[in-house]
Amino acid sequence: MSAPRRSDWLLPAIAALFALSIAYGLTLDPIEASLRNSLRAPGPDFPFGTDHLGRDVLARIAHGFLRDVGLSLTIIVCSLVIGIAIGMLAAELAGATDRALTFVMDLMTSLPQIVIALILAAHLGGGELALILALSLTGWVKYARIARATAFSLREREFVTAARLAGGSRLYLLRRHILPHLLPLLSGLVALQFGHNILNIAALGFLGIGVQPPAPEWGAMIAEARPYFSQAPWLAIVPGIYLFVMTMVALMLTRRSGVRQERASVDPQPAQPTR
């Protein structure tokens, strides 16, 4: 048996410390300001220091984590629903419909997602709802491509053909035979997009068109820290470290889910009948 590599335990250990600090920070108030504690350096009273308004940085990191994770998951769900629906529609209707939808996918792929999201979010006035809509309307394409390819590859398989000859409707075939094989294939992409969404949320927050103050958000925290970086560098460094760790954890989950994705794609089996 080979010795475990350092990377096999280092990142999980960092993630565990990350989780413990988040759990502690959630017990603190992220909004309460105290000007007499303004720009306090990290210490026993404030483990990560305070910002220019005297707010606890650890509390804002922890509550910003919840907000960013919630937004990222919401964007993933919306993107999944849109992408799967469009991908399956393209495969099922084929012909001109498939060509038109594929053209839209190609067009969306050729444009940088963050730039389109930036324009949409700014046009919608900023805020969390605008953020969700902008990133969902630009994030569905990858899911749609996988859904379309999976539906095309499975619709002529023996078990799908048998279900069709037995009188199964289009909706039944998609729900009972295509979708169960599609979801495992999307697991790796979901984990990867989770990390990408966190980065995009932070980027839009940094530019001031994402989550609005005084709500805590990592990108907005880094933007607020710019005028004070020379005297209080922890204001930008701490959320930057948490953003990095969060992205690395998402990449680690992507790598591990890749094994399950390969197994799911090797030999699709018919769905088990419900009792």
Tell where the protein language model's regions lie, with residue ranges:
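Non-cytoplasmic
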Residues: V115-I119, H123, G127, L131-I132, ...
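Transmembrane-helix boundary motif in ABC transporter permease subunits
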Residues: I22-G25, S72-D106, L118
